[in-house]
Amino acid sequence: MSRSSKAVLGLSVLLTAATVAGVHLKQRQDRQRLRDGVIRDIERQNQKKENIRLLGEQIILTKQLEAEREKMLEKGSQNT
């Protein structure tokens, strides 16, 4: 084999190996990004559930406060 043939063969083997390695790295990054996305989605769902629970508590507390205010206003108007 001539020197130029060996050089071309070596270069093509090198480029092929680099391409295969690049594809594997890209796939690994994509899989990790997908896993991270699932974890973020689960965290968002948990946060949403917590926000809904807190909103429910706030609604209950607001109703209790309004009921107490009504009682206080009724007592105040009865005393005058």
Curated annotation (Swiss-Prot):
Presequence extent in this chain: 1-22
Pfam family membership, one: PET117
Compartment(s): Mitochondrion
Cited InterPro entries: Pet117
UniProt key word Signal: no
Keywords: Mitochondrion, Transit peptide
GO cellular component: mitochondrion
Main subcellular location: mitochondrion
Family of this protein: Belongs to the PET117 family.
Protein name, per record: Protein PET117 homolog, mitochondrial
Taxonomic source organism: Mus musculus (Mouse)
